[in-house]
Amino acid sequence: DNTILYADYFLSKVLGLLKSNSQELDTAMFYVSDHGESLGENGLYLHGMPYFMAPDEQIDVPALMWLNDSMSKVFDVESIKNKEDLPLSHDNLFHTLLGLMGVETKLYDKGLDLMTK
């Protein structure tokens, strides 16, 4: 599918840009797809089936986190790796980004931040 190919291309460009600036800046990327995609599994194509009958390919979405060396020293990377098989939601994205950027707000829930133990 061309959109998957383009997403790979785009992410490689973003990572290249971040890496090229990681000596001067703290850089990180957290990518989460908004939905999965069926590419012919069980005769299904595309996405958008009702949740109760949608196959795992549409529900379980990819996520990718990258931190440069300086950010990896600030955050517990092993703690993040230990969460890779946990079921997560977009709720985690909001709180993880707040924690990653050091934003203090009463809305922040440390329990939903992937960067915490």
Walk through the language-model features, giving the residues of each.
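Catalytic domains that recognize anionic headgroups
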Residues: 1-117
